[in-house]
């Protein structure tokens, strides 16, 4: 069992895929598996995935019929062996320390989930740091209801909608499996 499985759904992203995969290979946390889920992409992505498979033993490839983003993420969950699971969209790149930092938070607080800020890079190259107005730390059920829910619903970044997304989080895989948490494919 590896420490962290990183699921990457792939569809028509050959322009961005190399940058994404390289950012995953550059993680300071080395005990990872990178699961590239080719969601029936009609471009060169399937071949690119096979090439990556030869580059690093931490890479796994799943080829499947196109079923959409949720279906691809679920396919990745199904083959993940990590104690924790993260998701990265294939047109994104992440900082080298992202998963090490998220793991350290989970380990420190013994929690099932950790979330980071992220930086949105616009087409014109402008960068915007996006974060929830939430203090770092452990949140029990009452604190989540009181402090987190209101921020998710009426956060200060309404121009982009709520910032709760899977691609800047790390999850305990046992928690996901225990409650059969999957992405809705409907």
Regions found by a protein language model. Name each.
Residues 1-186:
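Nucleotide-sugar donor-binding/catalytic module of glycosyltransferases
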């Amino acid at each position: 069992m590896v420490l962290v499985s990183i699921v990457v759904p792939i569809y028509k992203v050959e322009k961005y895929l190399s940058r994404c995969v390289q950012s995953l290979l550059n993680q300071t946390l080395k005990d990872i598996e990178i699961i590239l889920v080719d969601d029936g992409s009609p471009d060169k992505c399937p071949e690119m995935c096979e090439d990556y498979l030869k580059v690093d033993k931490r890479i796994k490839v799943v080829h499947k019929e196109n079923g959409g983003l949720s279906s691809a993420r679920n396919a990745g969950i199904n083959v993940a062996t990590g104690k924790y699971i993260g998701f990265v969209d294939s047109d994104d790149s992440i900082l080298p320390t992202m998963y090490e930092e998220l793991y350290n938070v989970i380990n420190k607080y013994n929690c099932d989930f950790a979330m980071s800020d992220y930086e949105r890079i616009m087409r014109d190259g402008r960068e915007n740091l996006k974060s929830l107005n939430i203090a770092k730390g452990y949140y029990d059920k009452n604190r989540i209801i009181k402090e987190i829910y209101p921020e998710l619903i009426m956060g200060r970044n309404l121009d982009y909608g709520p910032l709760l997304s899977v691609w800047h989080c790390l999850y305990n895989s046992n928690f996901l499996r225990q409650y059969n948490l999957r992405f809705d494919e409907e």
